[in-house]
């Protein structure tokens, strides 16, 4: 009986850390004709109607007219790790609003803004900027192409950019800095905070 409980706990922890997988490899290949060009501006509208514009840089994205660190969080409302970390991301955003902005991109589901608001934002206190747009898929494809990520995409999946460049991040499983350009699965705000401080000090 003890071994069964241990296995169940192990599987639950593994799923929380590894994220929700769509069971499809990232085979999307952006061509020159459909990829973003340097200087392109993408205006996003949040699920509550606020606006944010990101600008395509040579190798990434940045917030228009802002030098804030940008985190892009690819997630789904149904994803348990996404739900679990949402209130912590909200708290981190509130505490660091002067230097940091998170943009959440809904992925792998076709839902309307009201559904996201009622079933994610209100339930999990996720009132940071969430875009539920047809443009999301193209932005995500561009991100994965930028960082040469060719594996199956699991969510939550995050990248962090400063001055339009993807930043090296800690491994969120053990906290060591390994040079990944992404967080895969649930990540603690302690790790995010350490990485943000490091990025600010380096820049």
Task: Give the positions of each predicted feature.
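Bacterial N-terminal signal peptides that target proteins for export
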Residues: 1-7
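Bacterial signal peptide processing site
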Residues: 21-23
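A short beta-strand-turn-helix
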Residues: 43-70, 94
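Thiol-/selenol-based redox modules, centered on thioredoxin-like
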Residues: 153-203
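Aromatic-flanked redox-active Cys/Sec active sites in thiol-based oxidoreductases
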Residues: 72-79, 107
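Short, internal strand/loop/helix patches
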Residues: 120-163
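Structural microenvironment flanking redox-active thiols in thiol-disulfide oxidoreductases
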Residues: 84-125, 137-143
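C-terminal motif of bacterial Sec signal peptides marking the signal peptidase cleavage site
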Residues: 16-19
